[in-house]
């Protein structure tokens, strides 16, 4: 065999190998494209404390692996910290609102609890357990709790403080409901992918506080659906970042901005009017008309109030061809979210059937 023929043979083998590699790359690109089409990106948006992180936790419970005992144990410290944070917020508000303690000994309990560095809390034992129990039972603190719209207080306060005996027991393991109600402000971006009917739903939760919103921008590509959460109970509350701005007005302004973004022209919009349980409680003593004078419905009527709030948001949509899908939710209620998300999933799949070759 001549040198030329050996070289020609080597070259053709190299060319063959190059073509084989090229074909494999082409095949992989086609697979990637197909797989990307089978992934639906759901962007969870809304102002701070509207319930986005709780919604993601529910997806993990309903469509993922849920929370093992080991996972739940990881929330123990956070539950304790939430309890101290809530009581400290009320102790500070007692001063600001000039509410006296009914029982003199609670001044000492307040001093004790106030001195605690919440971020260092890792256990929950006496004298702190008794101090917090005594404080929570003081009529002054109860009055302060009833006036919580005048300062910042976690929605889970009553839930935890009414259950101190259980939480203070030795070997306490948080329940699923304890985990759902833990409040940890979201900083940065949390993604939760889960598989449903051979489609990957990638849910993206971004921080709702103003300082977090500038990080949203790069999440905006290829968004299938915007899931916007509004806390129905915020109609009489002020912002964490600015105590003279109404939280619901801020939520409306953000919603208006989001639905008019050019990035989202082809994304469906699903509006979750969340915390319906808190609205039902609050509407009995805090009147919607005091904060939204245009409301002309009956007082103490949760149904009328939530329909009015829904209309306020839907009316912000400038595009009459764009449908806004809406659901009233309670993000801490697993069965409610299971039911609502089944409907949402069907809506999203229906809207994307042809594009995703799922028919």
Swiss-Prot record:
Q: Where is this region: G2 motif?
A: 178-186
Posttranslational modification? Palmitoylated. Palmitoylation occurs in the Golgi and participates in the localization of GNAQ to the plasma membrane.
Listed InterPro entries:
Gprotein_alpha_Q, Gprotein_alpha_su, GproteinA_insert, P-loop_NTPase
Q: Where does Mg(2+) bind?
A: 53, 186
According to its UniProt record, this protein's enzyme class is hydrolase
Q: Which GO terms describe its cellular component?
A: cytoplasm; Golgi apparatus; heterotrimeric G-protein complex; membrane; nuclear membrane; photoreceptor outer segment; synapse
Show the segment(s) annotated as G4 motif: 270-277
Record keyword Electron transport present: no
Q: Where is this region: G5 motif?
A: 329-334
User: How does this protein sit in the membrane?
Assistant: Lipid-anchor
**Per the record, which residues fall in region G1 motif?**
41-54
SUPFAM superfamilies in the record: P-loop containing nucleoside triphosphate hydrolases, Transducin (alpha subunit), insertion domain
Q: Name one Pfam family in it.
A: G-alpha
Compartment(s) where it occurs, according to its Swiss-Prot or TrEMBL record: Cell membrane; Golgi apparatus; Nucleus; Nucleus membrane
According to its UniProt entry, the protein's GO biological process terms are: adenylate cyclase-activating G protein-coupled receptor signaling pathway; entrainment of circadian clock; G protein-coupled acetylcholine receptor signaling pathway; glutamate receptor signaling pathway; phototransduction, visible light
Q: Which reaction does it catalyse?
A: GTP + H2O = GDP + phosphate + H(+)
G-alpha domain location, by residue?
A: 38-359
List the residue ranges forming a coiled coil, or say none.
Answer: none
Q: Which GO terms describe its molecular function?
A: G protein-coupled receptor binding; G-protein beta/gamma-subunit complex binding; GTP binding; GTPase activator activity; GTPase activity; metal ion binding
Q: Which family does it belong to?
A: Belongs to the G-alpha family. G(q) subfamily.
Q: What does this protein do?
A: Guanine nucleotide-binding proteins (G proteins) function as transducers downstream of G protein-coupled receptors (GPCRs) in numerous signaling cascades. The alpha chain contains the guanine nucleotide binding site and alternates between an active, GTP-bound state and an inactive, GDP-bound state. Signaling by an activated GPCR promotes GDP release and GTP binding. The alpha subunit has a low GTPase activity that converts bound GTP to GDP, thereby terminating the signal. Both GDP release and GTP hydrolysis are modulated by numerous regulatory proteins.
* Known partners and oligomeric status: G proteins are composed of 3 units; alpha, beta and gamma. The alpha chain contains the guanine nucleotide binding site.
What this protein is called in its record is Guanine nucleotide-binding protein G(q) subunit alpha
Question: Which organism does this sequence originate in?
Answer: Xenopus laevis
């Amino acid at each position: 065999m001549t040198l030329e023929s050996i070289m020609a043979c080597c070259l053709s083998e190299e060319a063959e190998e190059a073509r084989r590699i090229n074909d494999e790359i082409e095949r992989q690109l086609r697979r990637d494209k197909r797989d990307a089409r089978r992934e639906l990106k759901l962007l969870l948006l809304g102002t701070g404390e509207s319930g986005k992180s709780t919604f993601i936790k529910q997806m993990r419970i309903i469509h993922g692996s849920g929370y093992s005992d080991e996972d739940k144990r990881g929330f123990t410290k956070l539950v304790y910290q939430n309890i101290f944070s809530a009581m400290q917020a009320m102790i500070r508000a007692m001063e600001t609102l000039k509410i006296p303690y009914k029982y003199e000994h609670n001044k000492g309990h307040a001093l004790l609890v106030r001195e605690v560095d919440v971020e260092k809390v890792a256990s929950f034992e006496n004298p702190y357990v008794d101090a917090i129990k005594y404080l929570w039972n003081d009529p002054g603190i109860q009055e302060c709790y009833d006036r919580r719209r005048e300062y910042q207080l976690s929605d889970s306060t009553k839930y935890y403080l009414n259950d101190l005996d259980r939480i203070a027991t030795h070997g306490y393991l948080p329940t699923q409901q304890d985990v759902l109600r833990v409040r940890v402000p979201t900083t940065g971006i949390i993604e939760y992918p889960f598989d449903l009917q051979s489609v990957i739903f990638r849910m993206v939760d971004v921080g709702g506080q103003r300082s977090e919103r500038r990080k949203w921008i790069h999440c905006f590509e290829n968004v299938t659906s915007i899931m916007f959460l509004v806390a129905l109970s915020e109609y009489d509350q002020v912002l964490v970042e600015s105590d003279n701005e109404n939280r619901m007005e801020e939520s409306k302004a953000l919603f208006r901005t989001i639905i008019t973004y050019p990035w989202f022209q082809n994304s469906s919009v699903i509006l979750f009017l969340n915390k319906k349980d808190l609205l039902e409680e609050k509407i009995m003593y805090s009147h919607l008309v005091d904060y939204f004078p245009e409301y002309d419905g009956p007082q103490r009527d949760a149904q009328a109030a939530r329909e009015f709030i829904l209309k306020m948001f839907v009316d912000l949509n400038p595009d009459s061809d764009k449908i806004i899908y809406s659901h009233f939710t309670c993000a801490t209620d697993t069965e409610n979210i299971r039911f609502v998300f089944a409907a949402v999933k069907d809506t999203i799949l229906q809207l994307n059937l042809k594009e995703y070759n799922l028919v």
